[in-house]
Swiss-Prot record:
It comes from Corynebacterium glutamicum (strain ATCC 13032 / DSM 20300 / JCM 1318 / BCRC 11384 / CCUG 27702 / LMG 3730 / NBRC 12168 / NCIMB 10025 / NRRL B-2784 / 534). Belongs to the intradiol ring-cleavage dioxygenase family. Its cofactor is Fe(3+). Its EC number is 1.13.11.37. Involved in resorcinol degradation. Catalyzes the conversion of hydroxyquinol to malelylacetate. Also shows weak activity with catechol, 3-methylcatechol and 4-methylcatechol, but cannot use 4-chlorocatechol, 4-nitrocatechol or protocatechuate. Fe cation binds at Y169, Y202, H226, H228. Binds 1 Fe(3+) ion per subunit. This is Hydroxyquinol 1,2-dioxygenase. Pathway: Aromatic compound metabolism. Keywords: Dioxygenase, Iron, Metal-binding, Oxidoreductase. GO terms for biological process: catechol-containing compound metabolic process. It holds the Pfam family Dioxygenase_C. One of its GO terms (molecular function) is 4-hydroxycatechol 1,2-dioxygenase activity.
Amino acid sequence: MTTTTADHNISAQQKAVEENLVNRVLQSFDACENPRLKQLMESLVVHLHDFIRDVRLTEDEWNYAIDFLTAVGHITDDKRQEFVLLSDTLGASMQTIAVNNEAYENSTEATVFGPFFLDDAPEVELGGDIAGGAQGQAAWIEGTVTDTEGNPVPNARIEVWECDEDGLYDVQYADERMAGRAYMHTDANGDYRFWGLTPVPYPIPHDGPVGNMLKAVGRSPVRCAHLHFMVTAPELRTLVTHIFVEGDPQLEIGDSVFGVKDSLIKKFEEQAPGTPTPDGRDLGDQTWARTRFDIVLAPGA
């Protein structure tokens, strides 16, 4: 298999040595009986070797890269997934989402999953409060889940999770409390509604190797304010997405994981103290916000 690299005035003999090595590695996969695995490994080798040859990678740089990935592994545990952060900050997560979620008519766009999802969040009734003691400005979020033909999707499962006003998720606290997350099901009309918190921008964990990488290249570790959604329903494509906050200054600076899409930016309308709430909840002298996020699910594969 022929590969391509930039011309670095390398001698023909040296090019032949490098090309021969690539071909030998590729031939090592000839006995692989899994066609997809063989394709993945061959493409990975070609692109990896092309990168090494293109930048003329030094041995010190390669050893540094190995140490970096080792550090990523060491800091990863059941509460912190540094490899997800690395994938996100390099845009690899969003690129994978892009190739696997081809735009379908008017379906809601997908974005990154993130490292803070838990699969054992509590269930709340429609209109319930997902905050669970997390602090922040109360926000009423509502919408309707439909398919691409406009039909309501009853009993769709909606998982939501978000940070508190300090930009921290529940899993980042030592007390192992569960807050700022829950799941619910749409009603017969496909409607959902709940109390949450107005999202705020926050930095991804940047006290580890990924944070060091961002600092070295002059990038901000801050994510734009957002609220996570995962929506599932039979025979429809599972949707992982966010809603972002219109007017968030971080939108102009940029999202550290490249997750923002214009269609997902929603206005959180701030309500004055004493403004009646949709469900009659008494918030006293507090301001609160409300937004609407209608969700359109694409057909399943």
